UniProtKB/Swiss-Prot annotation:
Signal peptide range: none
HAMAP family: UPF0502
Protein name, entry field: UPF0502 protein Reut_B4455
SUPFAM superfamilies: Winged helix' DNA-binding domain
Family statement: Belongs to the UPF0502 family.
Biological source species: Cupriavidus pinatubonensis (strain JMP 134 / LMG 1197) (Cupriavidus necator (strain JMP 134))
InterPro entries attached to this UniProt entry: DUF480, WH-like_DNA-bd_sf, WH_DNA-bd_sf
Stored Pfam families: DUF480
Length: 234
């Protein structure tokens, strides 16, 4: 399924903190969505971390906290600072350090930014990073990530009222999968009927899709006008 990376894989020596994971995900995302402003300045990177859309959970981190996260990621060779600009700019080295192809890196970035998602949701949410041909393609790369040693993702137990399994990244460390199963069982005992729950989830997905299309339109218009999208609070 995947192609062999250009260099041998190198494993992170420890689990990432939540802010480190957010920083890494933002760098991978913005590399594709706003290539004209990538590598990112500290200000743009912080704005990307604090986005109110396409983020779960929403964060409110300071530039100082982002700098600490950058330093931690530098120590793992996952991020490095460019030297061709007077303003410090940062870029990721995710593909090579983790030893994964661009398709897998796109999936990991989206899991870092948006939390657990189904294969169908990942296919939709990664479209600007990589256009997967179908859901089976997404699942193929997810399976590879799950079979990696150590594993980079895990398939979660299907929650009550859900038709598909969700996937979660493990770059922040191992998780207790049984706790997710217990949470799903507890959800089944709640007063919200499965059909109503599914309707609410469908509405949420529809709203998320609309927001993504609007974001893409704003970024395109900003690019045409020569405006940095991050300056608009994207």
């Amino acid at each position: 399924m995947s192609s062999t990376p250009d260099t041998p894989s190198r494993q992170p020596i420890r689990a990432l903190t939540p802010i480190e994971g957010r920083v890494l995900g933002v760098l991978k995302e913005k590399q594709h969505t706003v290539p004209d402003t990538y590598p990112l300045s500290l200000n743009a990177l912080t704005a990307g971390c604090n986005q109110k859309t396409a983020r779960a959970p929403v964060m409110n981190v300071t530039e100082a906290e982002v700098v600490v996260a950058i330093d931690g990621l530098k120590g793992l060779s996952l991020v490095f600072e460019g030297s061709s600009s007077r303003v410090p700019r940062f870029e990721h080295n995710m593909n090579r350090v983790l030893g994964v192809p661009s398709q897998s890196a796109a999936l990991l970035a989206m899991l870092l930014l948006r939390g657990p998602q189904t294969a169908a949701e990942l296919r939709l949410n990664t479209v600007r990073l990589h256009a997967f041909a179908d859901i089976s393609s997404v699942e193929g790369f997810l399976d590879e990530l799950a079979e990696h040693e150590p594993p980079y993702v895990v398939k979660l137990p299907r929650a009550a009222g859900e038709r598909e399994h969700r996937w979660m990244h493990l770059l922040g460390g191992e998780i207790n999968v049984d706790s997710f199963a217990a949470a799903g069982a507890a959800l089944a005992d709640e007063s919200v009927a499965p059909s109503e729950l599914e309707r609410l989830r469908a509405e949420q997905r529809d709203l998320s899709n609309r927001v993504q299309r609007l974001e893409a339109l704003v970024e395109h218009m900003a690019s045409q006008l020569g405006i940095d999208p991050d300056a608009l609070g994207a």
